[in-house]
A protein has these predicted regions:
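Short, solvent-exposed beta-strand-terminating loops
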Residues: 81-96
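Acyl-donor binding region in acyl/amide transferases
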Residues: 95-170
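Active-site/acyl-donor-binding loops of N-acyltransferases
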Residues: 82-86, 149-193
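Glycine-rich phosphate/pyrophosphate-binding loop shared by adenosine-nucleotide-utilizing enzymes
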Residues: 76-81, 120
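Non-catalytic interaction/Regulatory regions outside core domains
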Residues: 2-24, 142-157, 164
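Long amphipathic alpha-helical scaffold regions
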Residues: 68-73, 81-83, 100-105
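Short amphipathic alpha-helix that is part of the acyltransferase structural core
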Residues: 5-65, 69-78
């Protein structure tokens, strides 16, 4: 698959989960199944603390979009987690109005495969080591840069380290919501705003 050609065809509004999986795979992240999602949630709770969506919520999201929760394994151990997904127009509106609940996610707000996204949401970034953190962040950057550059991309920081990491890769604080960060849409693939 030529990811740049596919990204150009999709005009920065990717509708295909397999494209997200292909970009994540370039950074050694794999789409997680239900068992691995439970493991990834435990990793996130251990690193971030309470306030992480339930395993069932994560599994429902993966079933809904197909490629939203990824993990990096090193020597068999899960060392990195990336969870991100496209929002439909209703989800984008809820996010902008401060009504988006990331812990008790309503999958009706998430774009389905084939549905044009109104925004993209970075839901969880967690890693147990430097290599895991780097893979997760670089996959996140490339997913945005190649597939979702024409829509706003959001993430919420729950730790000071998370806030710094988001700002290093181009996120800026949201104008009205504390803790929410955004990358504005670009005019073309690979262009930063």
């Amino acid at each position: 698959m030529n990811l740049f050609a596919e990204a150009t065809f999709q005009n920065g509004r990717n509708t295909l989960p397999q494209n997200v999986a292909a970009v994540a795979a370039q950074h050694r992240l794999e789409v997680l199944d239900a068992e691995a999602i439970r493991e990834a949630r435990a990793l996130a709770v251990g690193l971030i603390g309470d306030g992480v969506a339930s395993a069932q919520c994560l599994i429902c999201l993966q079933s809904h979009f197909g490629a939203a929760i990824f993990g990096l394994r090193q020597e068999g151990a899960l060392t990195g987690l990336l969870a991100a997904f496209p929002l439909n127009a209703e989800g984008f509106q809820a996010l902008e109005q401060g009504a988006f609940d990331a812990v008790a996610l309503d999958t009706a707000l998430v774009a389905r495969p084939g549905e044009e996204p109104a925004a993209y949401y970075g839901w969880a970034f967690a890693a147990t080591n430097h290599d895991g953190g780097r893979a997760v962040m670089m996959a996140s950057v490339d997913i945005h840069r190649l597939l979702y550059w024409a829509v706003p991309t959001y993430a919420r920081a729950v730790t000071a380290d998370g806030s710094r990491a988001l700002q290093r890769i181009g996120f800026r604080p949201h104008a009205t919501q504390a803790g929410l960060f955004v990358i504005a849409p670009a005019l073309a693939a690979g262009v930063r705003t």
